[in-house]
Design a protein with these regions (language model features):
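Conserved N-terminal beta1-alpha1 strand-loop-helix module at the mouth
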Residues: 1-80, 85-112, 140
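Glycine-rich phosphate-binding active-site loops on the catalytic face of alpha/beta enzymes
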Residues: 71-83, 113-130, 147-149
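Glycine-rich adenosine-cofactor-binding loop
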Residues: 95-99, 110, 128-149
Length: 149
C-alpha cells in the first residue's frame, strides 16, 4: 500500500513524468459530472509504464470496469452499494473523513485506508494536531497518522 497519494484533475504528462512510483495517483475532478473513460485509460496506461498505482474518486463500477488499482471514496460519499460487488483481491478502497461520524461510515464501506483531514487551518474542516491524534485513535483502519499491522 502506498504511503503517499497525489490528487490530479486531468492528464498532465509533465507532472506525471516526475512522479515517484512510491506515490499513488487519485483522479478527482469536481468540475465534471461524468468521467471521460478515454482520459482515465490514458492516465492508467501512462502510470502503468511507471508502475504507479491509480485510483479514481467515487466511481467503483468504472474503476472495476477499467481495471484500476482501486477507488477513493470522498468524505461525502456514504454509499454502501459497492459491498454487494465482487471485487478483485488486489482492488483497494480508500477514503477520507473529517470527523468521527465519517470515520464510522468509511469503516462500514470497508475502506483499507482512511485519510483524516485537514490537519492544518486551510478550510472549514480544520482539525488541528491534537484533535487529529484523538480522532485517529478511534479507528483500527490504516490512516495517515497511524498504521496498524
Amino acid at each position: 500500500m502506498p504511503k503517499k497519494y497525489h490528487f490530479i484533475s486531468s492528464f498532465d504528462r509533465d507532472l506525471l513524468n516526475n512522479i515517484d512510483n512510491k506515490i499513488a495517483i487519485i483522479y478527482r475532478n469536481h468540475q465534471i459530472k461524468k468521467y471521460d473513460s478515454i482520459e482515465i485509460l490514458k492516465i492508467k496506461n501512462f502510470l502503468k509504464t511507471k508502475k504507479v498505482k491509480f485510483f479514481i474518486s467515487n466511481n467503483i463500477k468504472l474503476a472495476m470496469k477499467l481495471d484500476l488499482d482501486g477507488v477513493y471514496l470522498s468524505s461525502f460519499n456514504k454509499s454502501l452499494a459497492h459491498l454487494a460487488f465482487s471485487l478483485k483481491k488486489k482492488f483497494m478502497i480508500i477514503g477520507s473523513a473529517h470527523n468521527l461520524k465519517q470515520i464510522r461510515i468509511k469503516e462500514l464501506q470497508n475502506t483499507q485506508l482512511i485519510f483524516i483531514s485537514s490537519i492544518f487551518k486551510k478550510n472549514k474542516n480544520y482539525l488541528g494536531i491534537n484533535k487529529f491524534k484523538l480522532i485517529s485513535n478511534y479507528t483500527k483502519k490504516n490512516n495517515c497518522f497511524r498504521r496498524n499491522k
